[in-house]
Structures are given as structure tokens and as C-alpha cells.
């Protein structure tokens, strides 16, 4: 039996249950068994039943007729050619043979289709399905001498909530129906209507009707959909609300910053704020940008490894760098090629270009420059086959040793000295406990785990929160959170020196999500909104140092909480849902 074509069973009801909340399964009685066994179901008709003779005899007759008539006609054809008799002159016998050949051919052609399609054209009746159910029940019934199986009550799932939809104008209703029917592609609504808000509303309504699921809790109003058209998000149906908290003031390089953090994790902002307080009282933190360069690494292939090596020698030759830089820098007035590094894997070459990108994060900028260089290289290397503009030697949105060692984006180190009395009063721990915990957890523990750039407590928490608040690419949190946290007792063990080194902070203050109203406001709060008018790239570098400073504060506070044994207590107080989940679950499973 083909289970794919089997209709669903009707729902089981229990007349003994007045409220309908439960249904019971009980073994059938013996009288039911006798009645079921006495039931007979007529087999469904088949297409082959219409033949006057049994199928095997009919097949034998037509197979014999087809080949014998074909042999006879071929024999007559040869005789006519031999005696120069026109082929169109036929006798009655030959005419009958031709008709028999055509008839047998038609039958044989139809025969091979009958057996193939008759299982599809003959559908089993509802009684047949009942018979199959009867057989299945008999097969699964176990004959035992033990007492009957107790009744098992199965709770019904609650009915889904009805979809709450807004009433739309008649014209919009027609468009919604066209989207559902596939007449109008959903992605083309903005260009067809010329109104991004209206397009999102129509797409949202079509989505609810197609899926049968309500998205009433996803807000639609209060967002500028024009600002994301063609650059931030396609086919929008609403926007997500994430709370933004402020940690600070963060005293960094002599300036005070109020750091916006978009997060749904309790304790995160409070903990970072405590770290900022300890650093502020101790005189603040200082930061240094070690390197500023975005990378892109295409992969190219040659016929031999020797030829790929020739490209490597050409690109890494200092005499050729100026020419490559001129070609590369055409992509933007802010793009400045810094270095070219090439590595070989067989006959494949991976070329890592690094360039400064001003206040932009710079992925598009460096990709354009790489494209210019690849087109230029085809003159000297016509046999070069460009496989991809990115060969993962960049490496973007993936944990990679090349970023940990060489850096990508902004490489920043941030440090602070926290006085011993501040450690005791504000952080509720001791210098010795912090130093020991950092060595065993962040250094030795991460090494035991085989961590790549994860020699820290929770750098990604702070990086992600600041990234979302300021319009950065959240996916680049992967490499941007690579961090090593160092702690050392100084001044005869009275104070502690803490630092974070982050080689791959990928941020920008122009382009992408930084132009959105909420994210732009957070950048303005930090004083790094838009491009720097003083020096290209200054705002982006300052944002990177703020990220590192916030990470430093977060590391200091969390490590202190762990050393003092406060982590579990604080999270149980501030990072738990206040809802009675067990009660809600019980209500859901016991009510209709």
C-alpha cells in the first residue's frame, strides 16, 4: 500500500468524556473482532479487467501477430524490389497484414502503459483503507496472559490562536491575493507600489494568510522602511525591538563615553557598568590602535604549482607593490593598499590584500580594489583562472588563525590599573584571586579547550551588544571577539594591571546599518557618527577603542563576580524569567 496516497484517519472521539479534554484508548472487544473479520472488501477494478481474454493469452496473441506480420511484409517488400513492382500496389492480403501490424503495435504500446498506470488510475475506496487499518490493528495486538493494559489518557493540543489581521483597502486586498496566488512576486512590491511601508504591510498580510500564523507581536509601524530599501534588508514585514542599556561613564584616553548596549541578557549591562565604575575611580583606561586594515583574499588557479608560485613571487616583490597600489586605489579615494600576502596550496594561490578603508568597515571597498588588481594581472598571467573573489584566507565571519595572528580591521590593545582598595570595595574580591582565576580560566582553561582567540571570559557579549546598538555587522562578532585578557599583580601585589588585546575589531561609522535612525543615534551618543572631518578613519578607530574599553570593563566585572562566587546569585536574580513556566505548561497541557 502506498502510504503517501493514504488519506488521514478521522479523529477519535470518546463519548464517555463530557468535556472532551482527553480521549482514551482501549482494546476492542471480541464482538468487534468478529464483526471486523466478517467484513469483506471487493478488490478495486483494474484497467486490464476490460480485456475479453486473460492478460497473458492476449499478450501472446498480439506478440505473435506483430512479429509474424512484420516478417511477412518485409518479405513481400523484398520481392517487390527484386521484380520492380511498385510499393504502393498492394493486394488484399497485404492490406490486411498492414492493418494487423498497426493494430498489434497499438495494443503493445498500450499494454506497456496499462500495468504502469493502473495503480495510479485505480484509487482504493474508503473501505479498503478501513480493511488495511483492521489488518494493522491485528498485527499490533499482542496476545498475553497478563492483565489488560491500563487506559492511557492523551491530552489534546490546544487549538491555535486565530490570526488577527487588519482590514485592508479593497485595492490592497487584491494585491494580497495576487501575492498569495503568485501573480505578483513578493520581492517586487516596493518597486511596483512605490511605497515601502505599504509594501511591507501587504507582504505581512500575505505571509500570515499563507502560513496560517499570526505575527501580531511583530511591530510594523514606527519604522522608516525607505531607509533600508536596497541596502539593509529585503522583503521586510516588520522590525525587532531590542532594549538598549547604557554602561558608563567609560573613562578612556581622557574622554568619558556612555556606551550603548543592545541586549536581552540580564546582568550584562549592569556588570559592564560596574567594571566602568571601577576603572573610572582608578583613573580610567588607555588604548592603542596597533593596526588598521581590512582584508580580502581571492583564490586563483593555474595549470601547475610552478605557475602559481610565479604569481606569488610577482605579488610579493617590493618592486611591483607601487604599481599594484595604484591599480588597487582606484576603487575609492579612501582605499589605500597596505600589503599583499600570497600563500600556495598546490596549483591554487590565495592572495590576501590588506588596505585602509577610512571610516567605513570597508568590505565592499576592498573587494572593488581586488577586482581591479585581478583584471590587471590577467595581462601578465593570462592563464590565471579566478575561482572566487573570496577564498576564505581573508577570513570573514569565521574564526581563523590568520586573523588572530595578522589581524583584520582594527587591532587594539586596551589597559587599566585598578587599585587594590577598589578591587576590594567595588569588585568584592582580591587582586590575588583575580590573577589566579585569569591564569586558570582565561589562559590555561582556554588552552585546554583548544580555543582560537578565545582567551577571555565573555568578550563576545560586549562586542555583540555594542555592534547591534551601533549598526555594525553582528556576524563579524566571530572574529571581532577574538581577545586575550591578561591580569598581573603590580606594586608589590597591591594593585592589578588588566589588559585586553583584540586583533580583529571590524567596525565602521558610515555605510550599512550605521545610517539607520536608532543606530545613528547611538553613534552620535559616542561622538563618532558619520565620517571624520579631521582625519579619514578617526571615528572608526575611536569606535574600535570604545569597544575594547567596554570589553575591558566587562572582563574585569565578570572575573570579579566569578572569583567572589557571585555569578550564580546575580544571574538567578536578574537573568531569569519571572513567569511561572511550570504553571503555564500545566495549564496548556490540561486545557482544551
UniProtKB/Swiss-Prot annotation:
Activity control note: Regulated at the post-translational level in response to alterations of sphingolipid and sterol biosynthetic pathways. Negatively regulated by a PP2A-dependent dephosphorylation occurring at a site different than Ser-577. Completely inhibited by mevinolin (IC(50) = 12.5 nM). Reversibly inactivated by phosphorylation at Ser-577 by spinach or Brassica oleracea HMGR kinases in a cell-free system. Down-regulated by KIN10 through its phosphorylation at Ser-577.
UniProt EC number: 1.1.1.34
One BP annotation, GO: sterol biosynthetic process
Enzyme type, top EC level: oxidoreductase
The record's account of how the chain is modified after translation: Inactivated by phosphorylation at Ser-577 by KIN10 activated form. Probably also phosphorylated at additional sites.
Region (Catalytic): 172-592
Catalytic machinery residues: 265, 397, 473, 571
Region feature Disordered, mapped onto this chain: 1-45
Glycosylation sites: 16, 19, 329, 575
Alphabetical keyword list: Endoplasmic reticulum, Glycoprotein, Isoprene biosynthesis, Membrane, NADP, Oxidoreductase, Phosphoprotein, Transmembrane, Transmembrane helix
Residue spans of biased composition, Polar residues class: 12-28
Record NCBIfam families: HMG_CoA_R_NADP (TIGR00533)
Similarity comment text for this entry: Belongs to the HMG-CoA reductase family.
Domain notes: The N-terminal domain (1-178) of the short isoform is necessary and sufficient for directing the protein to the endoplasmic reticulum and to spherical structures.
Purpose of the protein: Catalyzes the synthesis of mevalonate, the specific precursor of all isoprenoid compounds present in plants.
Record-given protein name: 3-hydroxy-3-methylglutaryl-coenzyme A reductase 1
Recorded name of the encoding gene: HMG1
Amino acid at each position: 500500500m502506498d502510504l503517501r496516497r493514504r488519506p488521514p484517519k478521522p479523529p477519535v472521539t470518546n463519548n464517555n468524556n463530557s468535556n472532551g479534554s482527553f480521549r482514551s484508548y482501549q482494546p476492542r472487544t471480541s464482538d468487534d473482532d468478529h464483526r471486523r473479520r466478517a467484513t469483506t472488501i471487493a478488490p478495486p477494478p483494474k484497467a486490464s479487467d476490460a480485456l475479453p481474454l486473460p492478460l497473458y493469452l492476449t499478450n501472446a496473441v498480439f506478440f505473435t501477430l506483430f512479429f509474424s506480420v512484420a516478417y511477412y511484409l518485409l518479405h513481400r517488400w523484398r520481392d517487390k524490389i527484386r521484380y520492380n513492382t511498385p510499393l504502393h500496389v498492394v493486394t488484399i492480403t497485404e492490406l490486411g497484414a498492414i492493418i494487423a501490424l498497426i493494430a498489434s503495435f497499438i495494443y503493445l504500446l498500450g499494454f506497456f502503459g496499462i500495468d504502469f498506470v493502473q495503480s495510479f488510475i485505480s484509487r482504493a475506496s474508503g473501505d479498503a483503507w478501513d480493511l488495511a487499518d483492521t489488518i494493522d490493528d491485528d498485527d499490533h495486538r499482542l496476545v498475553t496472559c497478563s492483565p489488560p493494559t491500563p487506559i492511557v489518557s492523551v491530552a489534546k493540543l490546544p487549538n491555535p490562536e486565530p490570526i488577527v489581521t487588519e482590514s485592508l483597502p479593497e485595492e490592497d486586498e487584491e494585491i494580497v491575493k495576487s501575492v498569495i496566488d503568485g501573480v505578483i512576486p513578493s520581492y517586487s512590491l516596493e518597486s511596483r507600489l512605490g511605497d515601502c511601508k505599504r509594501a511591507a504591510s501587504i507582504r505581512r498580510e500575505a505571509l500570515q494568510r499563507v502560513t496560517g500564523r499570526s505575527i501580531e507581536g511583530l511591530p510594523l509601524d514606527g519604522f522608516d522602511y525607505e531607509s533600508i530599501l536596497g541596502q539593509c534588508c529585503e522583503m521586510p514585514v516588520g522590525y525587532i525591538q531590542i532594549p538598549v542599556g547604557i554602561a558608563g561613564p567609560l573613562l578612556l584616553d581622557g574622554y568619558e563615553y556612555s556606551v550603548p548596549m543592545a541586549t536581552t541578557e540580564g546582568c550584562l549591562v549592569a556588570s559592564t557598568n560596574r567594571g566602568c565604575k571601577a576603572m573610572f575611580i582608578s583613573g580610567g583606561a588607555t588604548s592603542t590602535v596597533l593596526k588598521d586594515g581590512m582584508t580580502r583574499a581571492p583564490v586563483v588557479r593555474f595549470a601547475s604549482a610552478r605557475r602559481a608560485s610565479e604569481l606569488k613571487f610577482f605579488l610579493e616583490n617590493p618592486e611591483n607593490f607601487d604599481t599594484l597600489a595604484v591599480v588597487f586605489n582606484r576603487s575609492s579615494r579612501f582605499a589605500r593598499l597596505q600589503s599583499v600576502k600570497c600563500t600556495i596550496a598546490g596549483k591554487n594561490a590565495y592572495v590576501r590584500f590588506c588596505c585602509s578603508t577610512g571610516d567605513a568597515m570597508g568590505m565592499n571597498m576592498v573587494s572593488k580594489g581586488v577586482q581591479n588588481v585581478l583584471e590587471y594581472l590577467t595581462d601578465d598571467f593570462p592563464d590565471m583562472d579566478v575561482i572566487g573573489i573570496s577564498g576564505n584566507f581573508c577570513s570573514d565571519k569565521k574564526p581563523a588563525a590568520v586573523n588572530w595572528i595578522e589581524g583584520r580591521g582594527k587591532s587594539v590593545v586596551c589597559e587599566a590599573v585598578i587599585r587594590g582598595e577598589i578591587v576590594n570595595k567595588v569588585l568584592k574580591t582580591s587582586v590575588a584571586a583575580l590573577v589566579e582565576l585569569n591564569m586558570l580560566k582565561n589562559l590555561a582553561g582556554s588552552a585546554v579547550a583548544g580555543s582560537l582567540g578565545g582567551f577571555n571570559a565573555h568578550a563576545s557579549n560586549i562586542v555583540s551588544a555594542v555592534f547591534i546598538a551601533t549598526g555594525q555587522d553582528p556576524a563579524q562578532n566571530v572574529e571581532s571577539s577574538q581577545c586575550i585578557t591578561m591580569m598581573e599583580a603590580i606594586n608589590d601585589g597591591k594593585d592589578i594591571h588588566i589588559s585586553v588585546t583584540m586583533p580583529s575589531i571590524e567596525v565602521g561609522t558610515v555605510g550599512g546599518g550605521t545610517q539607520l535612525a536608532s543606530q545613528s543615534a547611538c553613534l552620535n551618543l559616542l561622538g563618532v557618527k558619520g565620517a571624520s572631518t579631521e582625519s579619514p578613519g578617526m571615528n572608526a578607530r575611536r569606535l574600535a577603542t570604545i569597544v575594547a574599553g567596554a570589553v575591558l570593563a566587562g572582563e574585569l566585572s565578570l572575573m570579579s563576580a566569578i572569583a567572589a562566587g557571585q555569578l550564580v546569585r546575580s544571574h538567578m536574580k536578574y537573568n531569569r524569567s519571572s513567569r511561572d513556566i511550570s504553571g503555564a505548561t500545566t495549564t496548556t497541557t490540561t486545557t482544551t
